[in-house]
């Protein structure tokens, strides 16, 4: 029993500060960091600034990149409105296949955003389909 507790504590410490995410593409996303988030659920606060940083390898040559953010709430998936969709404002375009990219997106969570729990999926879409995709469990407070 003590060995299990020690192993659990070691895993918890090793995971501290790391955001748990699911790569919903083909393994392009190597790292995801959201300001103030760690563990299995990312809690963001209305009216506060947040920064998302994703490191990924481009899986295609593309002249443009489009950002698409989806939220799954109570079994229904909706596209999140009001967010910037031009990915070239956050990474240098054109993009070359195999290029290591660091995507940084900053913004303020609108104060009128309802308190909700959702699975949030962000996709970066190039000329030939999805370039990178990640899903996190999120909660707005």
Swiss-Prot record:
Any GO BP annotation: sterol transport
Gene Ontology molecular function terms on file: sterol binding
One Pfam family named in its UniProt record: E1_DerP2_DerF2
Signal sequence residues: 1-16
GO cellular component, one term: extracellular region
UniProt family annotation: Belongs to the NPC2 family.
Effect of residue 118 to V: In Lep d 2.0203
Keywords: Allergen, Disulfide bond, Repeat, Secreted, Signal
Disulfide bonds: 24-133, 37-42, 88-93
Subunit structure: Monomer.
Principal subcellular localisation of the protein: secreted
Intervals holding Sequence repeats: 64-65, 68-69, 72-73
Cell compartment(s), UniProt: Secreted
Classification via SMART domains: ML
Protein name listed in UniProt: Mite group 2 allergen Lep d 2
Phenotype when changing residue 35 to S: In Lep d 2.0201 and Lep d 2.0203
Region described as 3 X 2 AA repeats of K-V: spans on this chain: 64-73
Membrane-crossing segments per the record: none
Organism name: Lepidoglyphus destructor (Storage mite)
